[in-house]
Swiss-Prot record:
Disulfide bonds: none annotated. Pathway: Cofactor biosynthesis; (R)-pantothenate biosynthesis; (R)-pantoate from 3-methyl-2-oxobutanoate: step 1/2. This is 3-methyl-2-oxobutanoate hydroxymethyltransferase. Keywords: Cytoplasm, Magnesium, Metal-binding, Pantothenate biosynthesis, Transferase. It is an enzyme of class 2 (transferase). The active site is at E181. The keyword Ribonucleoprotein does not apply. It comes from the Bacteria. It catalyses: 3-methyl-2-oxobutanoate + (6R)-5,10-methylene-5,6,7,8-tetrahydrofolate + H2O = 2-dehydropantoate + (6S)-5,6,7,8-tetrahydrofolate.
Length: 264
């Protein structure tokens, strides 16, 4: 696989070609994903739940993300590697820059932050200092205590309109990717069409430019439960490499997610 850059993803959007992405946390699985030409990997703070056994992502630290970012980069030298900024690691623009630098030095090509228009100055400061940003909207797991649980976001018109405005504001501030989690497919379509940058979805229908899954869900090995929007590709193939290849194929052909794996 040749080195993947943000320009490749922009070209995918411009040409109407969908792309698949996944979380990854170690060198072995990163190598597996690279062998199947997975263009984008995310070292997610979801590691707090799937690796550390926590109830949520809040205990994850910058040091945790940096450690796993180094591991994933070792296994996949050519992917576009995103790294999550953990809870309270970007409370101010200055703090965000300091912590993002740690993750970029660990091998990330981009950092992902959760939140809306209140992050405009943070995104501006990061991008002005050569740190690419993915803006995460919708169900933002670090806000689980504000939401009162893991709930679909953007169902009512006011909330939906605000999310569209936030996506555009963050794009205009310099964000190069928007990630939507657990939002109605109709809202994901609005945002994808409104944004010039690539939009990645999880639990947001198949109208986005790209899709992402937590790898443990893709392989059906999550300890607690399988989200409605996820699919066990390993059960269909019996082989991890074939599972990744099938996931990638179904995303690229817009077969996944289908109606059974879409939030109305």
């Amino acid at each position: 696989m040749k080195k993947v850059t943000i320009n490749d993803l922009i070209k995918c959007k411009q040409e109407g070609r969908k792309f698949a992405t996944s979380t990854a946390y170690d060198a072995s699985f990163a190598q597996l994903f690279e062998s199947q030409d997975m263009p984008v990997l995310l070292v997610g703070d979801s590691l707090g739940m799937v690796l550390q056994g926590r109830n949520d992502t809040l205990p994850v630290t910058v040091e945790d993300i940096a450690y796993h970012t180094r591991s994933v980069r070792a296994g996949s030298p050519n992917c576009l590697l995103m790294a999550d900024m953990p809870f309270m690691s970007y409370a101010t623009p200055e703090q965000a820059c300091e912590n993002a630098a740690t993750l970029m030095r660990a091998g990330a090509n981009m950092v992902k932050i959760e939140g809306g228009s209140w992050l405009i100055e943070t995104v501006k400061m990061l991008t002005e200092r050569a740190v690419p940003v993915c803006a995460h909207l919708g169900l933002t797991p670090q806000s689980v205590n504000i939401f009162g649980g893991y709930k679909v976001q953007g169902r009512d018109n006011e909330q939906a309109d605000k999310m569209v405005a936030d996506a555009l504001a963050l794009q205009n501030a310099g964000a190069q990717i928007v990630l939507l989690e657990c939002v109605p497919a109709s809202l994901a379509k609005r945002i994808t069409e409104a944004c010039d940058v690539p939009v990645i979805g999880i639990g947001a229908g198949n109208v986005t430019d790209g899709q992402i899954l937590v790898m443990h869900d893709m392989f059906g090995i999550s300890a607690n439960y399988m989200p409605k929007f996820s699919k066990n590709f390993l059960a269909e193939t019996g082989d991890m490499r074939k599972a990744v290849a099938l996931y990638k194929e179904e995303v690229e052909s817009a077969l996944f997610p289908d109606d059974a794996h879409t939030i109305a």
